[in-house]
């Protein structure tokens, strides 16, 4: 069973992302920064006080069309205005998505906000302190005859950096509560995503209390598209390291400003 996680950057590098999605071999694909604009396809432009980025209007549908034998699950954290190529304004949903191969029965789904709560931004997207949702899916791995719970998370972005803060401590506690509620005794548990943390964050101590061990450590999880010096962002934690057959922080191909994380169990 292969689990793959990457911050998709709203599909900004869709020319590279699309063929990779089809070929990466994910049984469970966890994406962060996923977009959906009802009634619109193609390209939009996202703007906040710090950035202006091209994004796919409906990355959820774009990826789904390339994984027709996967079940899509989408948890929206917030929504706001984007512009189409004719400068028309549309409301775009933003969140995390998990695509599960049809060979894996989905036996449980749960989502929760780990920071804030759902917001509709009417006067533009804020640069920071946006709400964050996490999405947990519990599947049955038939060949291994076991249940696997996979939690997909996009952590709080703070303009001041990735250091621990009271908000990140609260986020870790909420995440731990979601993991506890979503899994059952004996489940292999995987938590993955763009956590926006430093490797020494107390979040890892809190999750270690649930038996979760980080596999990434201080590895570089950013690509050449990211120009800032701090190269830590994405992580993958597992409850049973002995079950891991393969783990990789994928340096190539580059499909985002984040490197993908892939694990075989």
Predicted regions and their residues:
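Active-site beta-strand/loop signature of hydrolases that rely on acidic residues for catalysis
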Residues: 3-7, 20-51, 99, 137, ...
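Short, flexible loop segments at the rims of nucleotide/cofactor-binding pockets, characterized by
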Residues: 5-10, 126, 164-169, 193
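Active-site environment of divalent metal-dependent phosphoester hydrolases
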Residues: 11-13, 36-39, 80-82, 157-161, ...
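Short, acidic/polar
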Residues: 11-21
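Structured beta-strand-rich core segments of catalytic domains in phosphoester-bond hydrolases
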Residues: 35-147, 249-252
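Charged helix-capping and loop-helix junction motifs
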Residues: 52-57, 165-174
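Metal-dependent phosphoester-hydrolase catalytic domains
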Residues: 104, 177-189, 196-265
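Metal-dependent phosphoester/phosphodiester hydrolase catalytic core
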Residues: 122, 131, 142-169
């Amino acid at each position: 069973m292969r689990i793959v996680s990457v911050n998709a950057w709203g599909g900004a590098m869709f020319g590279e992302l699309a063929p990779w999605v089809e070929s990466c071999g994910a049984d469970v694909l966890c994406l962060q920064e996923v977009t959906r604009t009802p009634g619109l396809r193609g390209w939009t432009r996202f703007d906040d006080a710090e950035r202006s980025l091209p994004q796919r209007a409906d990355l959820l549908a774009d990826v789904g069309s390339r994984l027709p034998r996967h079940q899509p699950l989408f948890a929206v954290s917030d929504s706001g205005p984007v512009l189409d190529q004719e400068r028309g304004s549309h409301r775009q949903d933003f969140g995390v998505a998990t695509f599960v191969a049809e060979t894996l029965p989905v036996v449980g789904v749960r989502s929760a906000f780990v920071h804030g709560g759902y917001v509709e931004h009417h006067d533009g997207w804020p640069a920071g302190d946006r709400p964050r949702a996490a999405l947990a899916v519990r599947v049955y791995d038939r060949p291994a005859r076991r249940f696997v719970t996979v939690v997909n998370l996009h952590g709080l972005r703070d303009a001041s950096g990735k250091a621990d803060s009271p908000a990140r401590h609260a986020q870790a506690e909420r995440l731990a509560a979601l993991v506890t509620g979503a899994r059952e005794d004996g489940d292999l548990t995987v938590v993955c995503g763009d956590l926006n943390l430093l490797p020494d964050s107390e979040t890892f101590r809190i999750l270690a209390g649930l038996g979760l061990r980080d596999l990434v450590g201080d590895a570089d999880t950013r690509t050449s598209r990211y120009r800032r010096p701090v190269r830590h962002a994405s992580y993958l934690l597992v409850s049973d390291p002995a079950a891991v057959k393969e783990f990789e922080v994928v340096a190539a191909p580059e499909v985002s400003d984040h490197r993908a994380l892939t694990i075989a169990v």
